[in-house]
């Protein structure tokens, strides 16, 4: 049993209170991100993790509460701080803060009755030694949240509050104040399910009650449990954000060509390349992640060569095309992974950019004369995108940029930069239904090696 769950062990057997287990799990998940810096997906997938004993309904509720708490963390903290004149006992984050934040999220932002959110938070506090002395504080604070909800409108209506100051500041400097605010607003909505289909996007969109994006991605607002959806077990489609599906499209016709997909797991782009008829070598340094890729390829019916190796040190020969989706800060994926904004620090960007530079040089060494190299990251930071490509082209004269035309990405001019690269933002693709809006923030550039 990991330390993450120690404080959640009840001092006496848990009673039958309906919904308590889901709230406790949500509190564990939030505390794991904020205090222990454990990614949300890592906690969800961990053997013996907080959701392991929950039924599907409670699992979904726990994830929803934790996700909402992370998306609106800045606002919720500001409200709690306003109500606690002396601050949190103990001086900061911990299980008590997680209980208050998840409780406030339910009261202010979710379709949960006030009395249920308050009483279950108090039950949590009373059940555990570390927080039992503060049960009256939990009760009073959350009752005040419910009673004073109209007083908090100005806080809740400012999207910038929910982005760490360092990150929002970078966005303002890079994209300007209005666009930074639009990005923050887009990240407040949970991302829809995006899928890449092998054929006939319109048919699948109709089957799922979704829409087809300009690039052919099918988007579904309320899909349900993914493995239970039609066509999943048959391998007719795979989950992949619309922005993440763009880089592999930039190679054009690759039928019969040898293509290396570096840093490939979990395999969405690998699947695209294989579906396009390429002979694909998929590389990843993580054997665990590579196993997941292999499972995905088997489900989809694609035959690819999977190699466990470090892309920076691999000696795999030359290829007609190389795709490098480099490890990055992932600041473009906050709408889909709300924990990212609270796990990363500004200093991480410098070290990641240096690593990307080394990987880019290594990837270039695998491109045959006349071949194509596509570099991509799911980051909004220029150091990991535009600046990375400018520096690479300055030091390697063998390569030049081959600009992307809007016609190659469904006529979507908004996402093509003046240099001919791809730059998507979370605020792109607005839709009347917020659940169908937005994209992951992505950067991609296409380079060709001289013959």
Regions found by a protein language model. Name each.
Residues 1-451:
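S-adenosylmethionine
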């Amino acid at each position: 049993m990991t330390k993450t769950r120690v404080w959640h062990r009840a001092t006496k057997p848990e009673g039958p209170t309906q919904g308590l287990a889901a709230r406790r799990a949500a509190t564990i998940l939030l505390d794991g991100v904020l205090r222990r810096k454990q990614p949300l997906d890592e906690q969800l997938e961990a053997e013996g993790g907080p959701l392991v004993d929950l039924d599907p309904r409670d699992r979904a509720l726990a994830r929803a509460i934790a996700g909402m708490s992370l998306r609106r963390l800045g606002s919720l903290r500001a409200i709690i701080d306003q109500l606690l004149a002396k601050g949190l006992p103990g001086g900061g984050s911990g299980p008590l803060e997680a209980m208050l934040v998840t409780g406030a999220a339910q009261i202010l932002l979710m379709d949960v009755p006030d009395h249920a959110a308050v009483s279950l938070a108090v039950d949590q506090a009373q059940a555990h030694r570390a927080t039992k002395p503060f049960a009256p504080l939990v009760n009073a604070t959350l009752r005040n949240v419910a009673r004073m909800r109209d007083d908090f409108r100005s806080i809740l209506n400012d999207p910038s509050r929910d982005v760490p100051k360092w990150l929002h500041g970078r966005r303002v400097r890079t994209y300007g104040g209005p666009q930074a605010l639009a990005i923050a607003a887009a990240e407040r909505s949970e991302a829809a399910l995006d899928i890449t289909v092998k054929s006939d996007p319109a048919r699948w969109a109709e089957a799922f009650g979704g829409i087809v994006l300009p690039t052919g991605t099918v988007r579904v607002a309320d899909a349900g449990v993914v493995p239970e959806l039609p066509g999943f077990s048959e391998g007719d489609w795979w989950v992949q954000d619309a922005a993440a599906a763009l880089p592999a499209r930039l190679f054009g016709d690759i039928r019969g060509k040898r293509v290396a997909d570096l840093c490939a797991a979990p395999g969405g782009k690998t699947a695209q390349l294989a579906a396009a008829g390429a002979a694909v070598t998929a590389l990843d340094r993580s054997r665990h992640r590579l196993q997941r890729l292999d499972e995905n390829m088997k489900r989809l019916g694609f035959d690819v060569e999977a190699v466990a190796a470090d892309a920076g040190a691999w000696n795999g020969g030359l290829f007609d095309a190389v795709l490098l989706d480099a490890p990055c800060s992932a600041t473009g994926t906050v709408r889909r992974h709300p924990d990212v904004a609270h796990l990363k620090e500004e200093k991480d960007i410098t070290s990641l950019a240096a690593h990307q530079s080394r990987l880019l040089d290594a990837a270039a060494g695998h491109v045959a004369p006349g071949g194509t190299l596509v570099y991509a990251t799911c980051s909004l930071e220029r150091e990991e995108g535009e600046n990375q490509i400018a520096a690479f082209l300055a030091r390697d004269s063998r390569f030049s940029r081959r600009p992307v035309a809007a016609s190659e990405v469904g006529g979507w001019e908004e996402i093509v930069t003046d240099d001919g690269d791809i730059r998507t933002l979370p605020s792109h693709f607005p839709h009347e239904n917020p659940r169908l809006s937005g994209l992951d923030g992505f950067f991609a550039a296409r380079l060709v090696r001289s013959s």
